[in-house]
Every structure is written in C-alpha cells, then in structure tokens.
Amino acid sequence: MSMRCLLVDDSARFLEAARALLERGGMQVVGVASTGAEAVSRVHDLVPDVVLVDLDLDGENGFDVALRIAGDTTAVILISTHALEDFQELVAASPARGFLHKSALSAGAIRELLGRED
C-alpha cells in the first residue's frame, strides 16, 4: 500500500507541483492545506501517514503547526526553501521526523527519511 501524504503550504503552485512529483513517485497525496487550521482538520479527517509542512506559512509558523498535528500514527516532515542550517536546532527540538529542502523533495527522499520502503 502506498504512503498517504498531506501537503501543507500557502503556495498553490507549490502544492500542485509537489502533488504531481510525489504521485509520480508512487505516493498517494490524500489532501492539501494552506493554513494550520486546515492542516489540523485534514489530519483528523484523512489520517495521512506523513504530513509535509512548510516552515513559513502565511502568518503562521510551521513549527507550531507541526506541534499541533504530530501524532503516533502521523509523521511530520518540515519543508522549506531555506537551508536546514538556518533552523537545525528548531527542527531537532520539534516533533518532526526531519527536514527536506523543497528542491530535494521526492517520494524517495521522504521514504528514506522515514525509513520506509513502500
């Protein structure tokens, strides 16, 4: 069974491109959200395996969103166009399973970060 993914970003263009990229890589994108509140609701309704959360949502902090949605069955990966070095301590202190630069985003990179092969 393919990994179920929720994308959280305030850029409609990025959401569209990321969905296409991940689906080509065999992931099932079950939904998208552009705000923290939408993300919380979608996680509750869709129960994805992994949620990709942009660090810089419009007026919201991706770290705060990660705190609200991380759970036993849902892994969170933080994403950004900024380098990990800019946020390394915050990422390490967050409930997120890791960080991916948006330019490195792929189904394979997500599977590797989560230690999954499906």
List where the protein language model places each region:
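Conserved sequence signature across two-component system core domains
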Residues: V8-D9, A33, V51
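Two-component/phosphorelay signaling modules centered on CheY-like receiver
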Residues: A12-G31
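The feature encodes the CheY-like receiver
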Residues: V32, D58
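Acidic catalytic/metal-coordinating carboxylates
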Residues: T35-E38, N61-D64
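Active-site residues of response regulator receiver
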Residues: D54
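As written
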Residues: G62, V91-G98
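Hydrophobic/aromatic residues positioned on beta-strands within the core alpha/beta folds
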Residues: I79-S80, K102
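C-terminal output helix
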Residues: D86, S103-L114, D118
